[in-house]
Amino acid sequence: MDACVEPSSRHSRLDRFASFISLQINKGPNPLFTGIIEELGRVHSVEQRGENARIVIEAHIVIEGTNHGDSISVNGVCLTALDIQRDSFAADVSKETLLRSTLGSLKAGTTVNLERSVTPATRLGGHIVQGHVDARGQLLGVEDHGESWTVRIGFPKEIARYLVFKGSVAVEGISLTIAGLTDEYFEVAIIPKTWEVTNLSTLKVGDAVNLEVDVIAKYVERLLEMSDKL
């Protein structure tokens, strides 16, 4: 192949990839999050409604500026805020979400990570998080280093291809960077601030956690699958 043609072709594919990503991220009303937890909420009640459930969560910060129907991430799951009160909000959780995520194990008193969806003025401090759980992982271990913690999370094989060393992953809705990776687990380094303002410190070895891989990895995979059509 002509060496002068190859770079041009490569740049063309990169340009199409950038346009594709931009289109996907901005194409609809789907809410987005950054993985920067704003507040630790507390589950007030869980009411079973057939195969679904309604949860009421005590909160303060995420209620500010939130209207009926707005989206709030609860442990990394995008939920619609309903019945907003001065110090709480409710949300309905579908059967599928109860089965796919850890929300099915919530009970009164459980601490949860909360984040409002982004606005045009929001700073993207973490990475793009959709609030769509890809899999449930398991907390395998926590190493306390005094001023930091190393958390080890086991994950199912179906999401392994989306995880890369130094890449992003959302754990319980928290934007984290993969500091260590094997075929069966990854490790993340936790700073004191994150330990303080999230539910990680309340989890025990063996607990299930919600995992969401970086959506950009999914778009790359899809682009490669559809490359002949773009």
Task: Give a label for each model feature.
Residues 18:
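Short polybasic linear motifs
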Residues 25-230:
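Conserved loop->alpha-helix
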